[in-house]
Every structure is written in structure tokens, then in C-alpha cells.
């Protein structure tokens, strides 16, 4: 029998449209960060609850996966930034040239673009929206407000969670 709930590999936490594209991404939970230039940074945090996990083996596994992917898609498509294991928690930091590289490498759909193009691509927005100013939620936003914002961009990540499809959405200017 399949487990009742599958752990999500990545959760959309933050997106920045600020000029600070060179900043490092520090997170203590699974995070995907789409930079202004389209580069994707991710942090995956996993609790290693078994004694047989080995940092060297994990790093070798990730390095081999990166080498296989970059061999087909170009050297700069995916980069292992850092892998560390501390106090039973593994933290993996990765960099992807494009959202398509993130999707191709992880098998998790990541879309970044204008809301209008997302609608044309078949994404639906049957969810609740919030207004965000200076990184803080300030209220709710209607679908009409979202659809009418020609310059609004969206990041959508689709991952299997608890045996069902779930969309994580964030719109930004």
C-alpha cells in the first residue's frame, strides 16, 4: 500500500524581483527562489532518520545526477552549490539556469512568467490570492485583480502532496 502522504520535495517560499540577484539563499525549509534573471535557486532540507545515511554517498549521488543532466543539457544548466549534513539534517543547495532546467532535473513542474501566458498555457487559478507589499501579506486579492494586471508575473510549482495534485502560486509585479 502506498503511503498516505508523500512529502513534497520543494515548497515555494519566496520570490524576489529585487536587483539583489547575487544574494545567497539561506533557508531552513524546502525553498525555491526564482531570481529576476530567471535563474532558480533551491534548498532542499531533509531529516535523515536512519543511521545508514552518509554525507559522502549523498554528495556522490547528487554529483552523478548533476553530471548526467548537464551532459545532455549543457554545463551551466544545473550546479550543486552545497550539500551538508548536520545534526541529522541534510541541506542541499542547487542552482538552475532556467525554470525548465529545474523541472527537467527534479521532475517537478515549475512555471515562471506572466499570468496571461500562464492562463494561455492551461494553468488554472482556482485558488485564493493575497496581496503582498514589501514581502508582507496585506489582504486578499480577487481573480479579477489578478487577471487584469497585465504585468503581473506568476510562479507555479506543481508537486504531488498527500496523493493529490497541489498548486503553489505566487503573483508578483
Residue map of PLM features:
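Sec-dependent N-terminal signal peptides of Gram-positive bacterial secreted proteins and lipoproteins
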Residues: 2-23
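Sec-dependent signal peptide cleavage junction
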Residues: 18-34
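Short, cysteine-centered beta-strand-loop-beta hairpins and adjacent loop/turn segments enriched
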Residues: 23, 49-54, 99-104
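Envelope-exposed proteins and targeting segments
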Residues: 28-30, 36-38, 88-90
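Short amphipathic beta-strand and strand-loop transition segments with alternating hydrophobic
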Residues: 31, 77-85
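Beta-strand elements of well-folded, non-transmembrane domains
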Residues: 32-38, 46-50, 96-100
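Post-signal-peptide N-terminal segment of Sec-exported extracytoplasmic proteins
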Residues: 41-67
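Mature, soluble, non-transmembrane domains
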Residues: 83-173
Amino acid at each position: 500500500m502506498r503511503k498516505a502522504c508523500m512529502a513534497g520535495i520543494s515548497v515555494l517560499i519566496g520570490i524576489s524581483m529585487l536587483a539583489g540577484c547575487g544574494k545567497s539563499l539561506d533557508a531552513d525549509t524546502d525553498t525555491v527562489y526564482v531570481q529576476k534573471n530567471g535563474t532558480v535557486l533551491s534548498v532542499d532540507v531533509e531529516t535523515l532518520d536512519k543511521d545508514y545515511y552518509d554525507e559522502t554517498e549523498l554528495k556522490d549521488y547528487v554529483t552523478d545526477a548533476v553530471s548526467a543532466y548537464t551532459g545532455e543539457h549543457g554545463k551551466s544548466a544545473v550546479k550543486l552549490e552545497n550539500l551538508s549534513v548536520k545534526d541529522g539534517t541534510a541541506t542541499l543547495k542547487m542552482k538552475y539556469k532556467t525554470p525548465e532546467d529545474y523541472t527537467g532535473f527534479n521532475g517537478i513542474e515549475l512555471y515562471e512568467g506572466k499570468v496571461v501566458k500562464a492562463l494561455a498555457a492551461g494553468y488554472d487559478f482556482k485558488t485564493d490570492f493575497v496581496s503582498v507589499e514589501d514581502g508582507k501579506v496585506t489582504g486578499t486579492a480577487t481573480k479579477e485583480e489578478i487577471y487584469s494586471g497585465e504585468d503581473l508575473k506568476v510562479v507555479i510549482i506543481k508537486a504531488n502532496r498527500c496523493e493529490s495534485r497541489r498548486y503553489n502560486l505566487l503573483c508578483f509585479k
